Amino acid sequence: MPGGVEGENSRMTSPLRPEDPTRVGDYDLVARIGKGGQGVVYLGKAPDGTRVAVKVMETSWASNSRARSRFAKEIEAASKVAPFCTAALLDSDINADPPYIVSEYIEGPSLRDAVLRDGPRTGAALDRLAISTATALVAIHQAGVIHRDFKPANVLLGPDGPRVIDFGIARHSEATVTATDSIVGTPAYMAPEQVEGRELTPAVDIFAWAGVMVFAATGQSPFHDETLPAIINRVLHQPPRLDGVDERLRPLLEACLAKDRSAAPPRCRSSVSSSATTR
């Protein structure tokens, strides 16, 4: 399969590299979709010809017990979430060499790619995106899962609506935070308590949701800057940049991105949940 976009509304793929596997389990791997911290996501084919997304742990991580444990937690988290809001988990083998996860293949670009290609969302399109992604997060939280890395690249714009993907650093909402896993995520969309390594609640996903909606409306995160230290400083100490955000959404997003985390999350969770139920 040649590199590039398969179609105007498809996900970007690239050819397999010489070091890539061509088959794992019962699945043929035909192209690369993307690469994460510990694994590569491939476009695959099931025995019946159905296209699937196959995440394969890189061999350099496969012998790391902590990495395998995180991979297993990703499988557990994805299996708990209602399939309407994510790419449904189809198969997995944590004991394979290397371990892999097979998910439903969503035909459509990520929100990040779509905004960079077509420009920001406005009007009804932005409203639909806000409500549908809020609905997905409510369902994820109802399953007892905190995503912890909600960002534009992890929202796929499928033909039947947005899907939230990549539960690689998600965990159960009652799990204990440890020093080794507390500070993970994408800085421009991380809540202050996540940056500081404090105890996490579903509120961190609501903060990220607001940041993603700002990106969808403007093409940039509300804490965009040139360097990682500058981004973190903005998250912790500077107000979000909301220029260009629709006035109807702005008060809610501003509240969700507030530095006073003790007051903002309950109000935002209530507002986001209310928005979701109006879908």
Predicted regions and their residues:
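Eukaryotic protein kinase
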Residues: 2-279
